[in-house]
Amino acid sequence: MATPHLYHRYNSKSSNKNINSSGNSTEVDRFIPKSVSRNAYKSIPMLNGFDISYSELCEKSPSPERLSSPEFFNELRNTGHYESISTTNEFSMSSISSSSESQVTRSGSARASRNDYSKLTKEQKDHRKNIAHSLGFQLPDRVFTFETTSAEILEKNKAIKNCFGPGSCAEIRSTFDFSTLSPDVARYYIANSNARSASPQRQIQRPAKRVKSHIPYRVLDAPCLRNDFYSNLISWSRTTNNVLVGLGCSVYIWSEKEGAVSILDHQYLSEKRDLVTCVSFCPYNTYFIVGTKFGRILLYDQKEFFHSSNTNEKEPVFVFQTESFKGICCLEWFKPGEICKFYVGEENGNVSLFEIKSLHFPIKNWSKRQKLEDENLIGLKLHSTYQAQAQQVCGISLNEHANLLAVGGNDNSCSLWDISDLDKPIKKFVLPHKAAVKAIAFCPWSKSLLATGGGSKDRCIKFWHTSTGTLLDEICTSGQVTSLIWSLRHKQIVATFGFGDTKNPVLITLYSYPKLSKLLEVRSPNPLRVLSAVISPSSMAICVATNDETIRFYELWNDKEEIINEIQESGIYGSNIIEYMEGIETTHNKRIR
């Protein structure tokens, strides 16, 4: 037998004739499959309600050689379940099942099959049933029906099809009796129902509790962004929603309306052989600070660049030079008060407190207008300085009440200071790590909870009770912890990572607290490194600086949840004694001895 033609889709309005190589017209057989194989045999459209008692199945299974032989297709025509469609036949169920000659042949064959089937033992019947199920004769998605099916089969097929409909598959699986089916068919139905229940359409209908995104919603180019773990070169303004970026010797502000605006020209610091190491917006006004490698602190006002008519003068409002000439690594602002204050951490381990104050220069013979302008001048005043770490200060953080200061250093520790008296700070605890500590964050909704993260030789996030210095919990990560940010709306914390797994690098991980389970991971196909990160003014997104000279924005939360002021519930500190000290009532009545 020659190799069969590929099957064609039936069209009652077009001719089914085909011209062979000799020029003669031949009838196209629609039901001959594409290839002679077991898969082709299984894909043949069979009866929707095929009953194995009417089939001419052999008591012994056919050999693989028979399935792959051309004679198999000749014998398939005589089984009574296969009929070619000629050009004279109309495509209807009545015409297919009403060919008189083939009808008699199939009827006689079916009656003989019934008589033979009634003589079979139970084991032989089960064997035939399993063979029919394995070949797919009773799958519910048949295309053609050549003979009338019984009511019992129709009810069973209806129940199975309902499982794949819009209803709940879990409810149908609980009510449908799969013991009446063979193991292969039961597995088929369950697998398809599970796939249906886990389809994207059903997942879209489920309301999401938070926005999960594995890709940034905005990426900004940042050429000359220094790949430095100890620098903090991005800041996000809470008052103007602008982003401040330090690029080498230059500083830029990016806004959605104006785009990138140059703040500090490259020439200003390059002539002094200096560069930018730290930038920070004041959280409650328009001031911002730029720190440099040689201890310069530059004070700017955003109004001078966006609300002033003279935008060509890009000079800082005030410049302060430290006596140590050491680099400014990090900066932390106090809460709003009568005086605008902030701490800076330096390369020599010092922590200095600065104030922004008005400057008055009463000079004679000045006009009234000039005198009023000079009275509005502002400047920086050094309040106090003390040695906080033995080596370079890497990170710094203030608690909510501004009476505790956490300082992370390159000496593999974080020191906790009581600054109730700003003139006489007292060291309370030294919190150890195995590498430099840059990532430090006080919890905004649990006042005595502090999180710290270690460098590349530590790679651990630790949680401390600040009143006692107790280590509450810790979790090991896959990379160098470069920043920690608490969520203001959820009991969650975000960690960003630097050096870590080069084959499968993780940039960001969102953890729940206190369970510390991973809720979201942002991975990168390339070995990227996050240098630092800041939270958005809306507390829904974070902005990260990476070593590929880009600034990336990730949305992690939504604004449906309200900002949490304070949480006083059991489990936050993981200790009954500490929770008792914090005034948290436990759900169980246990005596503390």
Curated annotation (Swiss-Prot):
Residues 1-11 have a biased composition (Basic residues). SUPFAM superfamilies: WD40 repeat-like. GO terms for cellular component: anaphase-promoting complex. The keyword Cytoplasm does not apply. Residues 113-125 have a biased composition (Basic and acidic residues). It comes from the Eukaryota. A motif (C-box) lies at residues 29-35. Belongs to the WD repeat CDC20/Fizzy family. Activator protein that regulates the ubiquitin ligase activity and substrate specificity of the anaphase promoting complex/cyclosome (APC/C). Required for the ubiquitination and subsequent degradation of the B-type cyclin CLB1 by the APC/C complex during meiosis. Required for meiosis I, late meiotic gene expression and spore wall assembly. The C-box is required for the association with the APC/C complex. Interacts with CDC16. This is Meiosis-specific APC/C activator protein AMA1. It comes from Saccharomyces cerevisiae (strain ATCC 204508 / S288c) (Baker's yeast).
